[in-house]
Swiss-Prot record:
It comes from the Eukaryota. Residues 1-15, 74-90 have a biased composition (Basic and acidic residues). Residues 27-58 have a biased composition (Low complexity). InterPro entries: CDV3 (IPR026806). It is found in: Cytoplasm. Residues 1-204 are annotated as: Disordered. Residues 185-196 have a biased composition (Polar residues). Its main location: cytoplasm. Keywords: Acetylation, Cytoplasm. Coiled coil: none annotated. The keyword Cytoplasm applies. This is Protein CDV3 homolog. It comes from Gallus gallus (Chicken).
Length: 204
């Protein structure tokens, strides 16, 4: 039983590896078509170098072929990066954006303000605070007429003993203490039976 499970797992992974190889070969075929133009340029450059410097001795015949293929791969990668480095200028004249150029002097000042100094406690007052919305002068507020509200004076405590607000004299009148609830009262505890009696009395 264990052998069949191992075989099925091996088959599964073998199929998966074949799919990966096919995908890689498909990618390499697409890359090869783009690399063919790059390799022709690289081979012409290599031919010119060989003519200028003469043939180079190699350790083995296969190593020279491997070096040329790796050189073409490097030149292909460099060509790819060169394509991304080239940027086209974009025309922003159609946009309704104001000119956003900063003079070098303002840029230097902002860099000085952003750089933290070692003795920040000493120079915290020396930071340029002249620019910003907080320095704009606001119109003077209208003078506010202060209305004097006279509060009734609180009664003076004699005796120096604290009394909570509920126990003080002159407070709210106390509610009469309520006794225990009347459980059998229909007004305090209405029941469905009493409502049924009420409905029956309405019918007649």
């Amino acid at each position: 039983m264990a052998e069949t499970e191992e075989r099925s797992l091996d088959d599964f992974f073998a199929k998966r590896d074949k799919k990966k190889r096919k995908e890689k070969s498909g990618r390499s075929a697409a890359a090869a078509s783009t690399a063919s133009s790059a390799s022709s340029a690289a081979s012409s450059a290599a031919g010119a170098a060989a003519a200028a410097g003469g043939p180079r001795p190699t350790d083995g015949g296969g190593s020279g072929a491997a070096a040329s293929s790796s050189g073409s791969a490097k030149s292909k990668e460099e060509d790819d990066w060169k394509e991304f480095e080239q940027k086209e200028e974009i025309d922003y004249s159609g946009l309704r954006v104001q000119s956003m150029q900063i003079s070098e002097k303002e840029d230097d000042e902002s860099e000085k303000r952003e750089e933290p100094s070692d003795n920040w406690e000493e120079t915290s007052g020396a930071v340029d605070r002249s620019s910003g919305p907080w320095n704009k002068s606001a119109p003077a507020p209208a003078p506010v007429v202060e209305t004097i509200v006279t509060e009734p004076p609180e009664p003076v405590q004699t005796g120096g003993v604290y009394r909570p607000p509920g126990a003080r004299e002159g407070g709210r009148p106390r509610r009469a203490q309520q006794g225990p609830p009347e459980i059998y009262s229909d007004t305090q505890f209405p029941s469905l039976q009493s409502t049924a009696k009420l409905v029956d009395s309405r019918k007649y």
